[in-house]
Amino acid sequence: MKSVGLITEYNPFHNGHLFHASLSKQRSETNVTIAIMSGNFVMRGEPAIYHKFKRTEMALSAVDLVVELPLIGSLSSSDTFAEIAIKTAQYLDIDIISFGSESASLKDLQYLATQMIDYEKHPDFKEKLKQGKSYPRILSELTHNDTLLQSPNNILGISYLKAMQQFAPHMSALTIKREGSLHHQTVIDHHHF
């Protein structure tokens, strides 16, 4: 039995999540869809809008199983969030991880993930961190490809891909183009409703 995993917060569950879950199952041609979902706290420790059981109930309209992401993942940066989520997916023997991204270019995101793993080992990277430069700024300077690093779902997708390369190299990835309003967009785009 083949499974696709979705690393989620569903804070709250909406039509975009339903679209992502449905398309992920269709494109991955899997039998089971598993959501690895944050509990009562979402990324970086923000309290969830709805209790985890209510969000699970909503999610089960689109997925077959919801497993709670360990709390340490929810309280962490995107790289640690991704690492904990991928390790959880590996424990569940998930075959494919599907995530949304603004670019929808798995090839470009995988290439950048590989570059970033190499750059993080470089002495210049560690020196720039000591100088107080931010992680995204250093990476955009080193990669010279800051367009992919300007979009929050691309950044999170790259974190998933890095974690997969390091901890679950047998796992496959699938990315779905994020449609509609962007993560930090302050104006609602009515053309996608």
PLM feature spans:
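N-terminal catalytic cores of NTP/NDP-binding nucleotidyl/phosphoryl-transfer enzymes
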Residues: 1-55
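Non-catalytic positions within long, well-ordered alpha-helices that form the structural scaffold/packing
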Residues: 25-26, 60, 86-90
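Active-site cores that bind ATP or allylic diphosphates and position pyrophosphate for catalysis
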Residues: 69-193
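Divalent metal-coordination and catalytic microenvironments
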Residues: 14, 59, 161
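Short, high-confidence coil segments that cap the C-terminus of an alpha-helix
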Residues: 27-31, 63, 94
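A glycine-rich helix N-cap at a beta->alpha junction
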Residues: 57-71
